[in-house]
Amino acid sequence: MNAPITQKNTAYISSDKLSLLELENSNKFINLLMVDGKKSRAIRLFYDTLVLLKRKNLKENSKKESLLGIIGQLSPKNSIEDLVNNSNKLSNNSNEEIKIPLIDNSKSDDKSNLLETISVLEVLSIALKNVTPSVELRKVRRAGNTFLIPAILSQHKANTLAIRWVIESAKKKQQNSKQNFAECLADEIYQAYLKQGKARQKRDELHSAAISNRANIRYRWW
């Protein structure tokens, strides 16, 4: 029998301080990823996704730091030209390392220092928060007609729906992609973190539909 995630069995993610909400989101995510009762496989898939998500977040932050470093090293005379050339070089030549003079902190690894400041589970929590709906639409029949009535969602149901949307979006993305499911899932989570992606679109569409049907609230019986 597989135990739920605790701070003890996630100790190897040393930079991530797990809050109660993050633990709850992680356990719920694993349960919704599970197929045919294979929880160990779902746990492995979840942590593969976290590793890919952390690399993606680290890569994006490294690009931002590199661009800030470029701006800091500009000369007053040709600052605009340097900025354009170096930023194009940074975006187009991803395999080529751009060396930027930074403050020497002995021989410490800049990436490891940056890694310590990034919590991948915090990214996951923010991503889920960005796609979590606050309302749902319930069908009610009145005089032979069916009306869609906005209703407030409980926090548990809203979080579950957000996770389902992210997983479903990743599955659809995998059908038209050469990436594996963990890569697609990490990409969808990161898109949600940026308030983008299919899951965010579903949330916005649901909220728009709720606003459009707000006049039907008078038919609510609960």
Curated annotation (Swiss-Prot):
Cell compartment(s), UniProt: Mitochondrion
Superkingdom to which the source organism belongs: Eukaryota
Gene Ontology molecular function terms on file: rRNA binding
GO biological process terms held by the UniProt record: translation
SUPFAM superfamilies: Ribosomal protein S7 (SSF47973)
Listed Gene3D superfamilies: Ribosomal protein S7 domain (1.10.455.10)
Annotated InterPro entries: Ribosomal_uS7, Ribosomal_uS7_dom, Ribosomal_uS7_dom_sf
Cysteines engaged in disulfide bonds, as pairs: none
Keywords on record: Mitochondrion, Ribonucleoprotein, Ribosomal protein, RNA-binding, rRNA-binding
Any single Gene Ontology cellular-component annotation: ribonucleoprotein complex
Assembly behavior: Part of the small ribosomal subunit.
Family according to the record: Belongs to the universal ribosomal protein uS7 family.
Known role: One of the primary rRNA binding proteins, it binds directly to 18S rRNA where it nucleates assembly of the head domain of the small subunit.
Protein name in UniProt: Small ribosomal subunit protein uS7m
